[in-house]
Amino acid sequence: MSFFGSNTSLGATSTPAKTTGGLFGSPFGGTAATSQPAPAFGAQATSTPAFGAQPATSAFGAGSAFGATAAAPAFGAATGTSAFGGSAFGSTPAFGAATTTTAGTGLGGGGFGGFGAAPATSQAGLFGAPATSAAPPAFSGFGQQAAASTAPASGFSGFGTTTTSAPAFGGFGTSQSTGFGGGAFGSTFGKPANTTVTPGFGGFGGTSFMLGQPQQQPAPISADEAFAQSILNVSIFGDERDKIVAKWNYLQATWGTGKMFYSQSAAPVDITPENVMCRFKAIGYSRMPGKDNKLGLVALNFCRELSAVKPHQQQVIQTLHSLFGSKPNMLVHIDSIKELENKKCQIVIYVEEKLQHAPNESKRILATELSNYLNQATLKPQLNNLGVVEALALVLPDEDQLREYLENPPRGVDPRMWRQANSDNPDPTLYIPVPMVGFNDLKWRVKCQEQETDTHALYIKKVESELTELKKRHATATAKILEHKRKLAELSHRILRIIVKQECTRKVGTSLTPEEEALRTKLQNMLAVVSAPTQFKGRLSELLSQMRMQRNQFAANGGAEYALDKEAEDEMKTFLTMQQRAMEVLSDTVNKDLRALDVIIKGLPELRQS
């Protein structure tokens, strides 16, 4: 049983049985018999009934609307003209137009569209233009196909335009499109407005229960397939322009930026430098990352600039110390600080723990243990407040990790080029290949090299300052050594004189020993040689005479006279000899340092290039 007396479901076609009367006339949607007495609601009648029959004049307005001649209806009866120029909700009205409307009885007529009924209306246009219109019901009905027609719109429609009427409220699932001014006030001024009405749910009893007409959706494809189609299978225009778009997509892929369009129904493909066709790629070599785990080095990456973090290093140390429980035996140290890309910086720390059994000794906490402790979920909020985004343990990769890295090429790098880079590695134990994809990676590598060069320059300046300091200390030490040598010689001479006097005093009146006798003989021979006129004594006498003559000349000219005793002369000779030796030692030291500096200067460019 249906809701309204038929044996079919909603929206199905059926022929209801005729009845002789009832409370509201015939069943809903049926045709009332004219031979029966006029019912109270919705039936046709030949005489004036009490309620709902065909009267001579309508209930609202004796004549037709705005001067048109028509028979006025009651509520739901068959009429010639509605109360306001047409039916209540379902037909297409016109001001002053002669309209003939055929309405069903009850709720199956034009009042609310009926369930399954399709009323038809024949009317004249606004200014005499002939038209034939199928007026849909007001609420479009459940399961009813909305009829499309071509007629001038009523009321406020355009002049001679063509429109398609649609349900007043669209119904469930109907879609209606008009031009500018369509809908309630007609179509576009002077332009035809095309309207397409599609039942959304297809009615109760239809074959479709979906929003709109079901369409076949294309199967989703992967990003790699979309990238390949955007170069090899462009189908946007269907002509030779697709080849031009494909070439443009290929050009964008080679430089690694842009968007590639390949279909009207698919989204464009974003291009990144990691794609396989990007030409701006290279492979360099970097030192093996990380250090020994026992050193305990952990890198803290900050999302702030270096200038904002560097002045607050002590605050960072205090905050980290509080995270470790503020233990007195835990000491936090900063190993280095450097700038990263995208306005970030990195601080490398390590933590020392003093041993309880040996307070003067300490050990470093392992880098992996320190990193795992800082990456706990309970400490993340405090680190985020400090500006730390991640904590990484700077440890050397193990053999498995290194093998996996070398055997699997990075995304967008040709495997053959990656294998060739592995084979060309100058020192596999110290360096690893690193890809440079795009200009951002190249810029970052150049920046890292500049920072490393600055570090080397600072180290060289430090070495130069240390060498200068060592030279000063060496000169001072050399002068002190010479001074000590001079004092040692003086003391040696004094000791020798004391020993001679002591021996002379001790051996007074005793005979000479055979050794002393041999020594005396040698000394006498030496004295005879020196005292010979043609030997050293004669030369010395000649030199002394010349010196006296020169002294006399200086005295005659008013020069100052001077005289040196023998001891002063000996001391002067000794001092001059020491000065000569000191100058020789200093000259040798300077020559050695100059040779060392030449080696450093020649090796500096090679160090910078490496």
Curated annotation (Swiss-Prot):
Its main location: nucleus. Keywords: mRNA transport, Nuclear pore complex, Nucleus, Protein transport, Repeat, Translocation, Transport. Residues 4-554 are annotated as: 25 X 2 AA repeats of F-G. It is found in: Nucleus, Nuclear pore complex. One of its GO terms (biological process) is protein localization to nuclear inner membrane. GO terms for cellular component: nuclear pore; nuclear pore central transport channel. InterPro entries: Nup54/Nup57/Nup44, Nup54_alpha-helical_dom, Nup54_C. Sequence repeats lie at residues 4-5, 24-25, 28-29, 41-42, 51-52, 60-61, 66-67, 75-76, 84-85, 89-90, 95-96, 112-113, 115-116, 127-128, 142-143, 159-160, 169-170, 172-173, 180-181, 185-186, 189-190, 201-202, 204-205, 237-238, 324-325. One of its GO terms (molecular function) is structural constituent of nuclear pore. Transmembrane segments: none annotated. Contains FG repeats. FG repeats are interaction sites for karyopherins (importins, exportins) and form probably an affinity gradient, guiding the transport proteins unidirectionally with their cargo through the NPC. FG repeat regions are highly flexible and lack ordered secondary structure. The overall conservation of FG repeats regarding exact sequence, spacing, and repeat unit length is limited. Component of the nuclear pore complex (NPC), a complex required for the trafficking across the nuclear envelope. Essential for the nuclear import of nuclear localization signal (NLS)-containing proteins in an importin alpha/importin beta-dependent manner. Together with Nup58, required for transposable element silencing regulation in ovarian follicle cells. By interacting with the nuclear (Nxf1/Nxt1) and cytosolic (fs(1)Yb) components of the flamenco (flam) transcripts processing pathway, enables export and subsequent piRNA production. Belongs to the NUP54 family. Component of the nuclear pore complex. Interacts with Nup58. Interacts (via C-terminus) with fs(1)Yb; this interaction occurs in a RNA-independent manner. Interacts with sbr/nxf1. Interacts with Nxt1. This is Probable nucleoporin Nup54. It comes from Drosophila melanogaster (Fruit fly).
